[in-house]
């Protein structure tokens, strides 16, 4: 489990792309721990992308907390545990270059297909209608703004998480 990437951010030059290694010390990286990619005290406004390698299966809820300067986060097809609220104070675009059986990202909306939960709305989702989901996850719409002044919730919606509409 990768616990801290601050040494990458506390350099004179933050790389344009932070590619998390698939192995550390000969062991596979299977997860990203709390605050692993927090840039609150680092990076100084230097934009970068993050590539999470194939083999990573889970991300803890605070792994990307305050990862302000990331512009894109690419997740692997092996990811199968991405909790609600994982992107608090994040405004990156999300993608799955190799696809993913559990998660989809369309029109900037990251959805857990298994639970039909909207987990995150990237900046590119602004002005798009909220997709037909059963749940709006915690802080899911932090980056989303409706087209106009009216918020239309999908008819399929059954529950709304904490701070889901605080965007």
Where do the PLM segments sit?
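Extracellular beta-strand-rich solenoid/capping regions of secreted or surface-exposed proteins
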Residues: 32-34
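Active-site/binding-pocket entry motifs
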Residues: 6-10, 38, 116-117
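Short beta-strand/loop segment at the start of cytosolic alpha/beta domains
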Residues: 1-10, 108-109
């Amino acid at each position: 489990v990768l616990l801290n990437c601050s040494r990458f951010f506390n350099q004179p030059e933050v790389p344009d792309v932070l590619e998390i290694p698939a192995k550390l010390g000969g062991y596979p990286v299977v997860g990203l721990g709390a605050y692993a990619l927090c840039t609150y005290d680092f990076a100084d406004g230097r934009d970068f992308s993050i590539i999470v390698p194939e083999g990573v299966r889970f991300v803890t809820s605070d792994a990307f907390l305050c990862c302000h300067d990331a512009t894109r986060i690419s997740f692997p097809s092996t990811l199968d545990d991405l909790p609600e609220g994982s992107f608090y104070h994040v405004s990156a675009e999300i993608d799955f270059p190799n696809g993913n059986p559990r998660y989809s990202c369309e029109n900037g909306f990251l959805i857990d297909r298994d639970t039909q939960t909207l987990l995150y709305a990237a900046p590119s989702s602004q002005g798009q209608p909220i997709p037909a989901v059963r749940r709006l996850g915690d802080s899911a719409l932090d980056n989303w703004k409706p087209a106009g002044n009216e918020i239309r919730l999908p008819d399929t919606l059954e529950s709304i998480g904490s701070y889901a509409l605080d965007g």
